[in-house]
Amino acid sequence: MTLRDATPADAAALARLETACFPGDAWSEASLSSHLSAPLCPACLMEDGGEVIGYASGRALPPEAEVYRVAVLPRARRRGIGLSLMGALELRFAGHGCDRFFLEVRASNAPARHLYETLGYEAVGVRRRYYRAPEEDAALYEKILGEEA
């Protein structure tokens, strides 16, 4: 497996990954291309045999950063890929001068919540009815560098 930075040239592959991971809420190829072209929007992806099997992206707004997306193909989960992607994304955020990270996750997504908690994120709130298809609350998480458990 290979971990590398994502570029706008990866937008089509990431759109396919989005569709597999987030049916009904997937980012389009055009949205991904725009995001990957924007300044201070790092993204990392994991490839296995040339196939993109996971990615993480966000936006740095120093001194803070927001994790936008973390996606791993269902058949590739529970192999440490999410952990590797999040670690790489956090390093890129830190390189932009960020030391406080935020994210939202579906309240029912126990595996993702466990991943974020393992990485030192703390639940700090709830956004009611944040998600659609299906409608669901978002759990808000925060991590401050130097304060990890």
Task: Give residue spans per PLM region.
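Extreme N-terminal starter segment of soluble prokaryotic enzymes
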Residues: M1-L3
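Acetyl-CoA-dependent GNAT
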Residues: D5-R75, L83-H96, I144-E148
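Enrichment for repetitive, rod-forming helical segments
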Residues: D25, E66, A76, R113, ...
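C-terminal "cap" of GNAT-fold acetyltransferases
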Residues: A43-C44, D99-F102, R106-R113, L119, ...
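Conserved beta-strand segments that form the floor/walls of ligand-binding pockets within enzyme
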Residues: L45, E66, A71, G80, ...
